[in-house]
C-alpha cells in the first residue's frame, strides 16, 4: 500500500497487455517519487482491449512482484482527455524511453497471444 501523503507518480493507460515498455516506464516513474499509482482505463472490450480490469491488474501485479508496496492499481473511467490549469504542485513529464522500447507494439503482442 502506498502512502497517500508522499509524492506519487501517476501512470494512465490501457495496459493491453502490460509489456517491457510499460515495465521500464514504471521503473523510471518509480525513480522520480518512490511510489506509483497505475490507473487502468475502463475501455470497452474489443480486439484492441481484450482484457478486463481484473486480468490487467493481475498481469501488472505479477510483473511488479519485486515492487510490492510501491504501487497501487486502480480502475478509472475511459479517460480520453487530460486537462489541467496552472500545474501548481505537480509536474507533467514525458519520460523518453530507448528507441527499441518505443518500438514495442502491444498490437503485435496481442496478435501473438491469439495465435
Locations of regions flagged by a protein language model:
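Nucleotidyltransferase catalytic core that binds NTPs
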Residues: 1-115
Amino acid at each position: 500500500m502506498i502512502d497517500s501523503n508522499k509524492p506519487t507518480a501517476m501512470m494512465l493507460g490501457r495496459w493491453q497487455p502490460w509489456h517491457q515498455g510499460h515495465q521500464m516506464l514504471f521503473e523510471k516513474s518509480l525513480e522520480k517519487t518512490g511510489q506509483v499509482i497505475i490507473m487502468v482505463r475502463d475501455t470497452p472490450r474489443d480486439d484492441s482491449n481484450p482484457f478486463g480490469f481484473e486480468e490487467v491488474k493481475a498481469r501488472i501485479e505479477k510483473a511488479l512482484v519485486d515492487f510490492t508496496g510501491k504501487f497501487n492499481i486502480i480502475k478509472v473511467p475511459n479517460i480520453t482527455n487530460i486537462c489541467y490549469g496552472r500545474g501548481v504542485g505537480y509536474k507533467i513529464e514525458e519520460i523518453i524511453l530507448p528507441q527499441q522500447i518505443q518500438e514495442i507494439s502491444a498490437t503485435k503482442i496481442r496478435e501473438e497471444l491469439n495465435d
